């Protein structure tokens, strides 16, 4: 097959060389964006008198036919045509004749592929934002049902202070909100058009870049043609934002895995999101949570891969940039899948409130309450800390907990202890009292839930 760019060449490449250089196996995912970009481009060419209205109409009819065929998965792509751009152009010329060759006037594959990827990511980032907000609504529902569910809060994976389970869940809500904000902000940089930048230096044709950008729904154009065709910051930013999101999902999955174990028993995964063992009949494995945790490394890898590709590229376009797509496609698929699985997993899990409650009565997570009690009576906090440390040591030596210590023993440690001490030792009271802004107190959680509902109200309505 003769190449659309083959005029300068006298020898054909070996088949294996063609296959090595071709990208159609993966960039065919850009077929809709490629055709839509071409529709805008030819409309602009006609407006500017670069092609006739009759020619433009014929080209658009051909493109509309190809778009219909693409949506029905009827297009047959060839490695010989290398990539999505030349495949579509070849099909167009076969469909409508040589006038199809006028489509590429005033355009290069360099600005064409960049335009395709801007259009693709704009659509996919909007989908991911919506999916993240749907996950946030699940967190809100779980938090509403567990405001007064008391569990241990941890530092160093050691029980630290009693908290509300809702407070723990809402911590992830706010992490995801930052992820949403990052994605939304990135749309400002995704939503600009490189179309018309040409190979690197613009074009001699009197094109109207602003018009084609407007037709495609972009908010503006790249100000520099070299930058337009060589920029992949918008993909790197997407991969970075996605790595951050996946890190948050992975952290939560790690906790879900721990909590579902026999050692914790704080939650039970729905059978829909767990699997068994081929040899051990008793097993119920949190495979979906483990997969999300594992796939996080995959997204990190896609980010570092493209950073490494980009670090040594001179301006403007280089064939290395063909390596920008597979990691992007893979990350989109991975993130969308993980968000969907995570939402279902959290929505269907069972919370073992009794086990959580037992965990905060058979530990020393209420020790800080005693230190605060003494500090409120005027004792310097460092002295209070020392006294409570000795009390904990006393309890561990006796095999008892702070609630089991007699008032007489407390008074031996400090004369400031009174009968009201036992009121603050209750995990429920400890949580309720921590009512500072952003704290785990029940009133603070209710305030946080109202704010969270306000941020997801459009999703809830939908």
UniProtKB/Swiss-Prot annotation:
GO annotation, cellular component aspect: cytosol
PROSITE patterns: FUMARATE_LYASES
Signal peptide (UniProt feature, chain positions): none
Substrates-to-products reaction catalysed: 2-(N(omega)-L-arginino)succinate = fumarate + L-arginine
GO BP: any one term: L-arginine biosynthetic process
Keyword Lyase attached: yes
Database matches in InterPro entries: Arg_succ_lyase_C (IPR029419), Argininosuccinate_lyase (IPR009049), Fumarase/histidase_N (IPR024083), Fumarate_lyase_CS (IPR020557), Fumarate_lyase_fam (IPR000362), Fumarate_lyase_N (IPR022761), L-Aspartase-like (IPR008948)
Location relative to the cell: Cytoplasm
Keywords linked to the UniProt accession: Amino-acid biosynthesis, Arginine biosynthesis, Cytoplasm, Lyase
Pathway terms, separated by semicolons: Amino-acid biosynthesis; L-arginine biosynthesis; L-arginine from L-ornithine and carbamoyl phosphate: step 3/3
Main location: cytoplasm
Coiled-coil region list: none
Record flagged with keyword Phosphoprotein: no
EC numbers on record: 4.3.2.1
Superkingdom of origin organism: Bacteria
Pfam families (alphabetical): ASL_C2, Lyase_1
Gene Ontology terms, MF aspect: argininosuccinate lyase activity
Family classification: Belongs to the lyase 1 family. Argininosuccinate lyase subfamily.
Record PANTHER family: ARGININOSUCCINATE LYASE
Name recorded for this polypeptide: Argininosuccinate lyase
Biological source species: Bacillus cereus (strain B4264)
Organism taxonomic ancestry: Bacteria, Bacillati, Bacillota, Bacilli, Bacillales
């Amino acid at each position: 097959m003769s190449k659309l760019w083959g005029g300068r060449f006298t020898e054909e490449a070996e088949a294996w060389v063609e296959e090595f250089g071709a990208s159609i196996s993966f960039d065919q995912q850009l077929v809709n964006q490629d055709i839509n970009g071409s529709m805008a481009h030819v409309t602009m060419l006609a407006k500017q008198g670069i092609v006739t209205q009759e020619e433009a109409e014929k080209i658009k009819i051909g493109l509309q036919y190809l778009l219909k065929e693409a949506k029905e998965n009827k297009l047959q792509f060839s490695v010989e045509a290398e990539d999505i751009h030349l495949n579509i152009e070849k099909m167009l010329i076969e469909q409508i004749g040589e006038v199809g060759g006028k489509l590429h006037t005033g355009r290069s594959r360099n600005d064409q592929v960049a335009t395709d990827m801007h259009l693709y990511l704009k659509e996919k980032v909007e989908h991911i934002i919506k999916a993240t907000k749907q996950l946030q609504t699940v967190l809100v529902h779980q938090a509403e049902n567990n405001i007064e569910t008391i569990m241990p809060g941890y530092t160093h994976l050691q029980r630290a202070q009693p908290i509300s389970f809702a407070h723990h869940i809402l911590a992830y809500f706010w992490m995801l909100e930052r992820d949403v904000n990052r994605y939304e902000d990135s749309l400002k940089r995704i939503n600009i058009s490189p179309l018309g930048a040409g190979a690197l230096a613009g074009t001699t044709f009197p094109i109207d870049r602003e018009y084609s950008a407007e037709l495609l729904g972009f908010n503006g154009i790249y100000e520099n043609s070299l930058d337009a065709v060589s920029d992949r910051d918008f993909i790197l930013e997407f991969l970075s934002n996605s790595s951050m999101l996946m890190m948050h999902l992975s952290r939560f999955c790690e906790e879900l895995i721990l909590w579902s174990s026999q050692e914790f028993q704080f939650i039970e995964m729905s059978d829909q999101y767990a699997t068994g063992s081929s040899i051990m009949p008793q097993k119920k494995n949190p495979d979906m949570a483990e997969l999300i945790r594992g796939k996080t490394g995959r997204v990190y890898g896609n980010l570092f891969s493209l950073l490494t590709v980009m670090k040594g590229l001179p301006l403007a376009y280089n064939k290395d940039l063909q390596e920008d797509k597979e990691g992007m496609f893979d990350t989109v698929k991975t993130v969308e899948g993980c968000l969907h699985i995570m939402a279902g997993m959290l929505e269907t899990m069972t919370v073992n409130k009794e086990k959580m409650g037992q965990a905060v009565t058979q530990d020393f997570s209420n020790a800080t309450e005693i230190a605060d009690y003494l500090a409120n009576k005027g004792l310097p906090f460092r002295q209070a800390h020392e006294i409570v440390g000795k009390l904990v040591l006393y309890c561990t030596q006796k095999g008892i907990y702070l609630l089991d210590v007699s008032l007489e023993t407390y008074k031996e440690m400090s004369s400031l202890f009174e009968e009201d001490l036992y009121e603050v030792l209750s995990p429920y009271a400890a949580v309720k009292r921590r009512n500072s802004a952003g704290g785990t107190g029940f009133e603070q959680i209710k305030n946080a839930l109202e704010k969270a509902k306000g941020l997801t109200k459009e999703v809830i309505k939908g």
